[in-house]
Design a protein with these regions (language model features):
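Bacterial N-terminal signal peptides
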Residues: 11-31
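Beta-strand-enriched cores of mature, soluble protein domains
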Residues: 37-177
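Signal peptide processing junction and immediate N-terminal pro/mature segment
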Residues: 31-37
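N-terminal secretory signal peptides that target proteins for export/translocation
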Residues: 1-14
Length: 177
């Protein structure tokens, strides 16, 4: 059987434009910025929160619910200030379940990021511990992902604070697209 050379050549030529577009797309993708994340690093430091009542405490069964407006200064990996809203449920046995969210602003003003946390505490000894996550950064915190824990102790009123405290945080920090 005789092969038609002209027919095979046209078939090859008909596939060249598609192959060209695939090749062009592959080359163009090499010029795009990498979507690879950096290596995680440690995050640690201290904080001093100042709690003030957002409203009067409410009683729900045996539990007392308190909403706090919190301002905090932070040192260490995150040096700056935070504005937070925290909801505490104080149970009849003195244990506390706490949840909060806020925004951190860098001391130099280079950026901000949002964070949330949840944890537990004790109205008996004033201790608190929680797990936090942060992200949605701006400026120097664009692409930030952070996660860790904090622990602290609360004391009574101090200056402009209905409740004051101090503590430490530790965790990981990662910048990724």
């Amino acid at each position: 059987m005789k092969t038609n050379c002209w027919f095979n050549r046209n078939r090859l030529l008909s596939h060249l434009p598609g192959s060209f577009y695939v090749l062009a797309l592959a080359v163009a993708s090499l010029t795009l910025p990498s979507a690879e994340a950096g290596q995680p690093g440690p995050a640690s430091g201290g904080f001093n929160p100042c709690f003030n009542f957002a409203g009067p405490p409410t009683q729900t069964g045996p539990n007392t619910i308190i909403i706090f407006n919190v301002t905090a200064t932070l040192t260490g990996t995150f040096t700056g200030s935070a504005i937070i809203t925290e909801r505490d449920v104080i149970h009849a046995d003195g244990s506390i379940t706490l949840h909060g969210s806020g925004i951190f602003t860098d001391q130099a003003g280079c950026g901000t990021f949002l964070f949330t946390y949840s944890g537990k505490g004790s109205a008996v000894d004033g201790s608190e511990s929680a797990h936090f996550v942060g992200g949605q950064g701006t400026g120097c915190f664009a692409g930030l992902h952070t996660e860790g824990t904090f622990q602290g102790n609360l004391v009574g009123p101090s200056g402009q604070c209905a409740v004051a405290g101090q503590g430490t945080y530790s965790g990981q920090i990662l910048f990724a697209p």
